[in-house]
Amino acid sequence: MQFHERFDVIVVGGGHAGTEAALASARMGSKTLLLTHNIDTLGQMSCNPAIGGIGKGHLVKEIDALGGAMAVATDFAGIQFRTLNSSKGPAVRATRAQADRALYRHKIQEILQHQTNLRIFQQAVDDLVVENNKVIGVVTQMGLAFEAPAVVLTAGTFLGGKIHIGLENYSGGRAGDPPSIALAHRLRELPIRVGRLKTGTPPRIDANTIDFSLMTEQKGDNPLPVMSFIGDVNDHPEQVSCYITHTNERTHDIIRGGLDRSPMYSGIIEGIGPRYCPSIEDKINRFADKTSHQIFIEPEGLNTTEIYPNGISTSLPFDVQLNLVRSIKGMENAEIMRPGYAIEYDYFDPRDLKNSLETKAISGLFFAGQINGTTGYEEAGAQGLLAGMNASLQVQGKEAWAPRRDQAYLGVLVDDLSTLGTKEPYRMFTSRAEYRLLLREDNADLRLTEKGRELGLVDDKRWALFSEKMESIETELQRLRGQWIHPNSPLVEALNPNLNTPITREATFEDLLRRPEMDYPKLMSIDGFGPGLEDQRAAEQVQIQVKYSGYIQRQQGEIDKAIRHETTLLPLDLDYQEVPGLSNEVIAKMNEHKPETIGQASRISGMTPAAISILLVHLKKRGLLRKSA
């Protein structure tokens, strides 16, 4: 049965990747359909009730800078906000919010339902319709066919999903939801490499059975951070505390005693789990010398007693889960409301994707989120936005776009995946970015919002606020650079007590701000130097740009040198056997990875500078030197 309307873009899946993909495509004017197996679970936080953190918070800010929904929803749902690494430099500072699951889901659904050009339909997808290596639509569980020249697949952990608790297992996409078995079989027919990964979640605890007085309270920051560049602290709901406790040697003995019934250690689970979010049984095994592990006791919302014990993800049998929970300080009488479990699922090798997240094998088919081997809401949301945007661009006959590694963490994420691939769930860290001084949370809008506006992702309200902020920053920087003070100035009397050494020669206000002992609020509070900017985010930007200007210029110089050939395109039909001077090893690597650019080729493990030079000479001789947009 054919659906009565045709769409430009179809998005399959309504998690963090799917919602951002659908919203991005619709914002850009494409007639978009979001297909989900359950409208009520759109925007569901399937695992931990938190958004942001080191590396992840940077991605959220970038999604926001491009007009996405994640940061806005977090501001309306966040019940505790903290700035991590606040004592360190701005490059590694990151915002993290504890979120109320219900409020977050509600806000995402509200944004989806009010988005023009977006239709939502509840049906699981069982089949892709492909003709001549080009996608032309999908078919749902009940045989309803939808047509579109671009399809974005964001199936999360649902493809061939299998849930494990102890030695018992059953098919599922997550607890309470069915898996996508038919679609998984269909995708395995495509010429795209497939593998299995695993992730897990801890048991949920009833707060009424926890003794919080035996734990360490962890309050949020004051003043409260905001996640979105257009957000306000007044958007935040009531704020609550988290708590910290620890496992102990008794806990570890209980876990060791249950390993013979662990699906991970009995060989039942074959998928590789996340290195940076291991199960508690994996921690005990890998770090056998540690006598305790930290656990964060996180509320799941304001109107629920469910607690998420972050740090004890497990797939051990229920009786072992209960015993290990009750061995932990403050949880001696705890009751489990939902058992922890592990889930195995299909993922597809992201090296088979272009950096637009379109599959190389099937034109018009895009993958985003855990299907590409990543883990985390933020990584999924960022990919979803990029895939939805590029699906829309393709339908409009425009060239695909993806940020470079020096432009965004999203650029690092996509380049890592499409160039290097992954054999374990990929998680973003600031350490993955070589140009992290330029890729800060605070300047994500300065880096990306103008491009987002050009692409049609950024609405008038966000653009007006951004333009006002940019003008404020530029005007204030010009003022600081243009105003001078000399040793005999009447302003010196008020200034010198705030300096480590009095000024002895003429200096601009910018020179004063560059001093280690001076910051922008202090300088503006001194008579004759203020009043300065009222907008705290603009003021922060002024301070960072002044204090780090030398380092920023140096890093920009490195980038300018590095990107000289970064975007030089490698023709898809280039026969590497015909390139004189390439070793058989390099030819094999190029044929396996199929890089789109010289930059991607240079990051393939084992690729030599000599091989890159040979490729460039060959392209030049053949008149094939072209750069991507």
Swiss-Prot record:
PROSITE patterns assigned to the protein according to its UniProt record, in alphabetical order: GIDA_1 (PS01280), GIDA_2 (PS01281)
SUPFAM superfamilies, per the entry: FAD/NAD(P)-binding domain
Main location: cytoplasm
Keywords noted in UniProt: Cytoplasm, FAD, Flavoprotein, NAD, tRNA processing
GO CC terms in record: cytosol
Binding-site positions, NAD(+): 273-287
The protein's name: tRNA uridine 5-carboxymethylaminomethyl modification enzyme MnmG
Organism of this sequence: Shewanella halifaxensis (strain HAW-EB4)
